[in-house]
Amino acid sequence: MLQRFQELPTSEPPVRSHVARVLGSVALASSKAGQTERSRQEPRAALALDESIPEAYLVLGEYMFQGNDLAGALDTWEHGLRLNPENVALARRLERGRSEAQRLGGLERVTSEHFSIAFDGRADVPGARASLEVMEAAYRSVGALFELYPDGPIPVVLYPDRSYEQEGHVSWSAGVYDGKIRLPSAGANSTSLRFRGVLFHEYAHALFHRATGGKGGPAWVNEGYADVAKLVADPGPAVRCTPDVHSFQLRVLEQSFGRIGSHKQAHLAYLEARHAVEHLVDRHGQAGMKALFSELSTGAPFATAFERAFHEDYAAFATAFDAEAGR
């Protein structure tokens, strides 16, 4: 498509401007779909025709941001906003980027074959290197669960002066995955099973995002499968959720766990989500989970994707799962 646009006659300014706007819109769609290379090429092609296109600055800055080039992203958004001072999307994205820069302090990067880790170089070099080692192990082990091995570099951000103990469960505190794996760095130790388990869990979220084409799914599927991945690195004590301790209706766990009010309740929610996913894995295997992710990537409603992947009704599954608590 990009080549066809470039072949259009663009000597006339109105034509150039129109083609640039179309390319900007296409670039935005490519970025939302996770098409990394097109997210780099299309906005640059748009800006070559018309340097004022705001969508092109949004996408190009996001491409740099996801590559942990925070300074380049900020420069790109700032330039775009100077040319489009009334553009709300650019202003908001720039504000979020500046907030992240303040949290990270003196930004440095270390890279491996598959990951690029941004961190506060004044304090976090050992934590960054420990994280890099564990993430490469997760690439192999969690990748095997999803049968998914993305091309690198996959961006990771370590936040200084925050520990896993302070954060509780990282996913619960970190919020919605936005293309970067975000972790506190204090207590990073590549030999710690807990540390390894947290990173495996977080990498599973990144693969869930990619496996579903960015469409996502219910929180209990995302968090439950991530906890299955966590057990690969950190088996921990033999704690399994049993039906008598179900604390939530399964449909309640479709929404973000960030709404849950306490660490104890959050812990029970994660156990229950993992229990539900273990039911699915026991019945349908990893191939069934892969089929579910594939159906979700089409944008189908979850109940439809569930029925197509497992050939059973989601409402019936949820009702039976909830009924286990009363047995």
Q: Where are the language model's segments positioned?
A:
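TPR/TPR-like (Sel1-like) alpha-helical repeat modules
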Residues: 3-6, 65, 70-89, 94-101, ...
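Juxtacatalytic substrate-recognition/specificity segment
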Residues: 106-218, 229-237, 246-259, 269, ...
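Beta/coil-rich, acidic/histidine-enriched accessory regions frequently appended to metallopeptidases
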Residues: 1-4, 18, 22-45, 52, ...
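Helix-start (N-cap) detector for alpha-helical repeat units in TPR-like alpha-solenoids
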Residues: 13-16, 20, 54-55, 88, ...
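Active-site-proximal alpha-helical
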Residues: 142, 247-315, 326
